[in-house]
Amino acid sequence: MKTKVEEYLEKERISYEALTFNQTELNDFQKILKQKQIDQNSVCKTLVLKGDKTGVIIAVVPLSEHLDYKKTRKISGDHKGGFPGMDFVMASTGYPHGANTPIGIYRKHPDYLFLVDASFKEKQMLVMSSGEIGRSIKIARTDFEKIVPFTYAELVE
């Protein structure tokens, strides 16, 4: 069964590769990436933040990196901002922690601020959640740029 994001990509005729990871594989994710010949620096994590001026901010950063709050606040124009509680994340995105996907969030909330770390500009392919824990997609960066309007920015420490 396909996720809503996968169904949307097929409807729009956007090429992607579905990736599934069982619980054991999630525990040994780096090994699985190597087996599937996926550059770990092309794997995205989608973070949901709450700013005092902009409201919900969706930040997409490399899986192995940490978000720099100060840089993110400067880009968003917020004085205060950070990670809200899980209840807020679920209510604001419709996705549980670990399943947030920028494609799915944008389809429901095009008014949110979407920021993507500038390091992804150099990548041909990106791997990101497809909206369910253990489910991801591999998609061309150029296709991602066409379906989710976002700003590239230096977001990591």
Question: For the regions a protein language model found, what residue spans apply to each?
Answer:
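Extended, low-hydrophobicity, polar/charged segments
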Residues: 1-157
